[in-house]
């Protein structure tokens, strides 16, 4: 019983503490887009399912979605004639001799705090430069509201950043240690109302963790855990 109580207290203290918040990413002032249509011309595609590269192809993007991948002919041959046509207000990129592949998803990407010594702008741009287009921030260490604000700005294309998924540390923001399954369910429901994408668990008594995970799944949210 003593071990269980100490564990609950430690989890509560850890999850209630946050990194000191770092400066948010500034409004985007450089770069182009979004465009009504973007066509990546003549690229060799690695589609990420283990199949060999294919190409050249034209990749057509509209409203932030890939709507068509069309053959652009044969390698080392003149381009085909029936290629997708660019719409008014669109943008073409000549990518012959280059490769394209899906953006990477970083499933454990802490945006960090002041101890890291870098602002959010640097972290976001570093991820983007390495091809990471979606990150999951387990614990949302700068606070859930802070992380959700950056998520919204990224989705609106107002900052240069990957897509962001915010996973709250289990028990974060609770008014008291979560010592019963009922308190766990109550916290999970409140976390969902706040707009979190999921929960990160650091450990809890089996009945409490079971209740939290089941309620979280029922609400359509996801979860992850710190296993070490």
Identify the function of each model-found stretch.
Residues 26, 34, 95-107, 119-228:
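Divalent-metal coordination cores built from histidine and acidic residues
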Residues 115:
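Catalytic Zn2+-binding segment of zinc metalloproteases
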Residues 111-112:
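Short active-site segment of divalent metal-dependent hydrolases/proteases
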């Amino acid at each position: 019983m003593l071990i269980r109580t100490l564990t609950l207290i430690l989890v509560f203290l850890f999850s209630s503490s946050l990194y000191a918040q770092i400066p948010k990413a500034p409004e985007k002032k450089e770069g182009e887009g979004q465009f009504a249509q973007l066509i990546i011309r003549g690229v060799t595609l690695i589609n990420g399912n283990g199949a060999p590269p294919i190409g050249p192809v034209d990749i057509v993007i509209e409203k932030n979605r890939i709507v068509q991948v069309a053959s652009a002919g044969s390698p080392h041959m003149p381009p085909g004639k029936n290629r997708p046509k660019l719409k008014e207000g669109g943008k073409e990129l000549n990518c012959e001799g280059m490769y394209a592949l899906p953006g990477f998803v970083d499933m454990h990407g802490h945006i960090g705090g002041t101890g890291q010594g870098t602002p959010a702008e640097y972290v976001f741009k570093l991820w983007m430069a390495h091809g990471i287009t979606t990150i999951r921030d387990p614990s949302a260490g700068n606070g859930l509201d802070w992380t959700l604000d950056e998520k919204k700005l990224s989705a609106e294309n107002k900052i240069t950043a990957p897509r962001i998924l915010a996973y709250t540390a289990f028990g974060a923001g609770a008014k008291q240690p979560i010592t019963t399954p009922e308190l766990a369910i109550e916290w999970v429901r409140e976390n969902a109302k706040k707009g979190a994408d999921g929960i990160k668990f650091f450990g809890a008594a089996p009945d409490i963790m079971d209740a939290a995970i089941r309620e979280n799944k029922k609400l359509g949210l996801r979860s992850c855990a710190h296993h070490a």
